[in-house]
């Protein structure tokens, strides 16, 4: 990373640690909206998966700011809750793999075992820590082969702080929050007003003015996609917000967290017809679209064609640049992978850990018009 980015990110980490009670980033006025460069809608979306987490610890403020700087159309996050009911940005329900919680001896007695999606999981869980306690933890890189120099330097951020980063960007940047593990969140966290996790999620979005159907004037001003692996959550919030929603799809052998169906059943024509009134697209694991055997691509399924025939967008996940994530056909070249998915498979957006790489590819192959 160039030095010009390092000092601002380190200074930001200090601000985040000391200003947890409010959004950290100056929110733009209504007048500023009109002067911002608009969201591009002429080519598939560059979706910053947990921020630019190929370079910086995932779901931290610097990772999101870096992704915006590199050209992300949307910054993606996972929403969970703290013990005291504050919505936070963190992918896993436990803290073990992406924070330094194990180094905090004061929390040694917080280790628990919970059943999560039908499996027993042991570790340190977000639902056993207040926001104040979570803010003392430092984020770290999930993968040991990625840059470790920023481990422990950046804290967990709240949903409000994440939104503020997008709203204060120098151009219009969309948000892509996930209603993460809603069954577990509703089991473990109880809000004083009797509301559910999904209620709190939507309330936060409304507080910041997110509304409007896909490509509407309101949506273009503050773009958003709401995502979840739990179809019941997307159906539940459908009467609360008209913001566009996408249904996430995992490996076909896995059971959904909120029903007893496998994702093989979820990708059937009948289920796509059922979910279509509630969503504008699906977000499948890429190997669900194109199966893989011995790291080689098999014959693509017809999932994209069946989704497109129903006017559903397709945003697969996750595109990573490292060799161990690239199938043999791509000869260790992420540009070949982008070309395959965007031009042969024909998807509508890519979730990537390397926003800058995808942006550079798109600018090379399909540069935006000058006004965008």
UniProtKB/Swiss-Prot annotation:
According to the record, what induces this protein's expression? By phosphate starvation.
Which residue positions carry a glycan here? 120, 239, 260
> Biological process GO annotation list?
glycerol metabolic process; lipid metabolic process
The protein's matches in InterPro entries, at most eight in alphabetical order, are given as:
GP_PDE_dom, PLC-like_Pdiesterase_TIM-brl
Question: Where does the UniProt annotation place the signal sequence?
Answer: 1-21
For the keyword Signal, the answer is yes
Matching PANTHER family: GLYCEROPHOSPHODIESTER PHOSPHODIESTERASE GDPD6, GLYCEROPHOSPHORYL DIESTER PHOSPHODIESTERASE
Name of protein = Glycerophosphodiester phosphodiesterase GDPD6
Query: What organism does the UniProt record list as the source?
Result: Arabidopsis thaliana (Mouse-ear cress)
Give the organism's phylogenetic lineage: Eukaryota, Viridiplantae, Streptophyta, Embryophyta, Tracheophyta
Q: Which gene encodes it?
A: GDPD6
